[in-house]
């Protein structure tokens, strides 16, 4: 029987973390799922924890700098295969706005 849930440290609201079982995410076509091995907390996570970000919604799972192992693939492009060790670039970006051209994809103005 395959695992159907995973552990997640959920920030329910400012200053309130809750370790809980959450459903294992489905893998949509063209994507791969990564089983986390290590996750880092950065300044934006601290701001979220303290409630200092106006753009933030709760609940949320902190930690967007991570590495892991691919555990499922659903037609993902490229040379990916189950068992590959990967790190994740956590930002979607347009690649052409001022912020993206300055390698500050986390500040992309087009998304």
Question: Could you say what each language-model-derived stretch is?
Answer:
Residues 44-50:
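Cytochrome P450 core scaffold surrounding the K-helix E-X-X-R motif
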Residues 21-23:
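Generic structural detector for well-ordered beta-strands
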Residues 25-39, 52-101, 106:
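Glycine-rich beta-strand-centered segment in the early N-terminal region that forms part
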Residues 15-19, 43-44:
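Short N-terminal binding/cap micro-motifs at the start of the first secondary-structure element
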Residues 10-12, 50, 101:
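Residue-level signal for short segments within beta-strands and strand-turn junctions
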Residues 2-9:
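Short structural boundary motif marking the start of a folded domain
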Residues 13-16, 91:
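Short, surface-exposed acidic/glycine-rich loop or hinge patches that mediate macromolecular interfaces
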